[in-house]
């Protein structure tokens, strides 16, 4: 059951990450610095090959997400489908 939610989060976060990076006009390297992570690790997120850690999610919500409450509301909807 937990793996199911992890897969939902992975896909949801990936879509939001790409949208945010595009909107902020940042390169992968710039986004990795904003999220305080190695560029190689960021690229794995950017390609949808990895799921975010709790720290990465928190940094994204604080520094990159236009509306964190909307993000969480939309994620809740995905979890409840």
Predicted regions and their residues:
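A short, Lys/Arg-rich alpha-helix, primarily the initiator
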Residues: 1-23
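Residues in the recognition helix of alpha-helical DNA-binding motifs
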Residues: 20, 34, 45, 74
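DNA major-groove recognition helix of helix-turn-helix/homeodomain DNA-binding modules
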Residues: 53-71
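Helix-turn-helix DNA-binding elements, focusing on the entry/boundary residues of the two helices
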Residues: 17, 28, 39, 54-57
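Short, charged recognition helix plus adjacent turn
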Residues: 2, 7, 69-81
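The alpha-helix within a helix-turn-helix
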Residues: 21, 32, 61
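Short alpha-helical DNA-recognition segment
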Residues: 25-44
């Amino acid at each position: 059951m937990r793996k199911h939610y992890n897969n939902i989060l992975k896909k949801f976060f990936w879509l939001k990450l790409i949208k945010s990076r595009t909107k902020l006009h940042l390169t992968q390297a710039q986004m990795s610095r904003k999220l305080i992570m190695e560029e190689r690790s960021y690229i794995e997120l950017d390609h949808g090959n990895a799921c975010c850690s709790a720290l990465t999610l928190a940094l994204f919500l604080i520094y990159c997400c236009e509306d964190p409450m909307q993000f969480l509301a939309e994620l809740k909807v995905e979890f409840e489908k």
